[in-house]
Amino acid sequence: MRKLKILFSMALVLATMVLCMIPSFAATSNKDKVYTALVKNGLSSAAACGVMANIEKESNFNPSAGSTSGAYGLCQWTGGRRSNLFSFCSSNGYSSNSVEGQVAFLMHELRGAYSGVLNSLKSVSNTADGAYNAGYRFCYDFERPSNKGSRSSQRGSVARSSYWPTYKTRDEEIKKAEAEAKKKAEEEAKKQQVIDLVKVFDHYGIAVEFVNATL
């Protein structure tokens, strides 16, 4: 048996200090948003790099990008596919000019009419050469620009030389960040419990001490 003192003022100050130490995070770039969404939808880092190389050339990662031909968005959808993009986003609670909505629609297309492209993306090795192959196949079979042979080769090269060095280990980093975020959320829940308990003590005037508490 021993005396356990609980000081309300000290607990409140401590809780405030802990909350002030919570870090703030900068806004995520559109490139990172696209990469994260693609990986969460089952693509490897190499496959995601291939898609991103194409998005760079199509829209420079601007989901509001348009053209005189009526093309729109990250992948410059036209005609009926552009209309389908708007309908999909409206039906699924996305803004049609959001990265999240457009990547969701992209995956919707890849799982549907363009399932062959998705199979190609999933078959590439998770290597620099795999990034090249993903960039080439996505351009050749999905984007289908004029001079698609030479452009597919160019985009494959961009995927291999520009995106793969940056993103080759990013999926591991995402998993690590998610684990850390979960841990932080659990810690915050515990901090909130302390704050709530202190408020209860204060409400009932239990701020000085508990005497003869059993440990």
Regions found by a protein language model. Name each.
Residues K31-Y35, A48-M52, L74, E100-V103, ...:
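Extracytoplasmic/secreted envelope proteins and their assembly/folding machinery
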Residues I22-A53, K57-N60:
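Export/targeting segments at the very N-terminus of extracytoplasmic proteins
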Residues L4-S24:
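Sec-dependent N-terminal signal peptides of Gram-positive bacterial secreted proteins and lipoproteins
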Residues T28-K33, S59-G130:
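Peptidoglycan-targeting cell-wall enzymes and recognition modules
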Residues I55-S59, L121-K148:
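Acidic helix/loop microenvironments that form the catalytic cleft of cell-wall polysaccharide enzymes
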Residues S153-E178:
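A recurrent domain-boundary module in secreted/ectodomain proteins
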Residues Q193-L215:
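Short, low-complexity, charged amphipathic interaction modules
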Residues E172-Q193:
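Intrinsically disordered, low-complexity, charge-biased segments
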